Amino acid sequence: MIIDLHVQRYGPSGPARVLTIHGVTEHGRIWHRLAHHLPEIPIAAPDLLGHGRSPWAAPWTIDANVSALAALLDNQGDGPVVVVGHSFGGAVAMHLAAARPDQVAALVLLDPAVALDGSRVREVVDAMLASPDYLDPAEARAEKATGAWADVDPPVLDAELDEHLVALPNGRYGWRISLPAMVCYWSELARDIVLPPVGTATTLVRAVRASPAYVSDQLLAALDKRLGADFELLDFDCGHMVPQAKPTEVAAVIRSRLGPR
């Protein structure tokens, strides 16, 4: 079964040249600021399953998202595209490259969350289930501003709340996501590494101030062994929210992988 994703388009009309894949709990419009730095590039920015305005029905797996993204590219692409994945989106991007190498011209992996320690995942999920929502928007904003979004400009954080924070039936506030789906996706992040095919041009951006770190030495060694000269590692001085904290630099990386057309 192929599921249609809600897709935000940026840039001129026409076949997508870039596919962006967001992280767990996020949405396609999170790429809005980055897209402003690539105004002439047609970009497809979907909400993943269980996120935003895409369907919330199960299954909630990497494989289900890969199938939906492949169908999206079959409909909105015209040949291989540069696939940009942040965090969980980086894991999905690697699986997409392995499953449909004909659709992937290059990978840009922004602090990808791949093969995380299972105990760490359990702690994150326990905390998420213990405190799944917020008293008011101010509490939601404070959590992000003192966490992974600490080095993101305040107006960008404000736009995130305007788009993604919603009032819940219980009178509290939460993100526009399916909580059961998030539990499943965090579990998916503990899966073994799935590498892109040999010859896949790949840039991995490591957020050096992400704590705890998402990018492991195991992942870097595996990519380097598989891809050799086709693998590039860049270190950015920022926290985990790389596309929001460093949009100019990320846009330059994407341009370097696009090439002429």
Swiss-Prot record:
Catalytic activity: a carboxylic ester + H2O = an alcohol + a carboxylate + H(+); a tetradecanoate ester + H2O = an aliphatic alcohol + tetradecanoate + H(+); decanoate ester + H2O = decanoate + an aliphatic alcohol + H(+); an octanoate ester + H2O = an aliphatic alcohol + octanoate + H(+)
Activity regulation info: Is inhibited by tetrahydrolipstatin, a specific lipase inhibitor and RHC 80267, a diacylglycerol lipase inhibitor, but not by phenylglyoxal and iodoacetate.
EC number: 3.1.1.1
Stated name of the protein: Lipase LipV
Consequence when changing S87A: Loss of enzymatic activity
Keywords (A to Z) from UniProt: Hydrolase, Lipid degradation, Lipid metabolism, Serine esterase
pH dependence per the entry: Optimum pH is 8.0. Retains nearly 60% enzyme activity at pH 6.0. The relative stability of purified enzyme is high at acidic pH and neutral pH (4.0-7.0) as compared to its relative stability at higher pH (9.0-10.0).
Family, similarity comment: Belongs to the AB hydrolase superfamily.
Domain of life: Bacteria
Protein's organism: Mycobacterium tuberculosis (strain ATCC 25618 / H37Rv)
Induction of synthesis: Expression is early up-regulated during acidic stress as compared to normal whereas no expression is observed under nutrient and oxidative stress conditions.
Any one GO biological process: fatty acid catabolic process
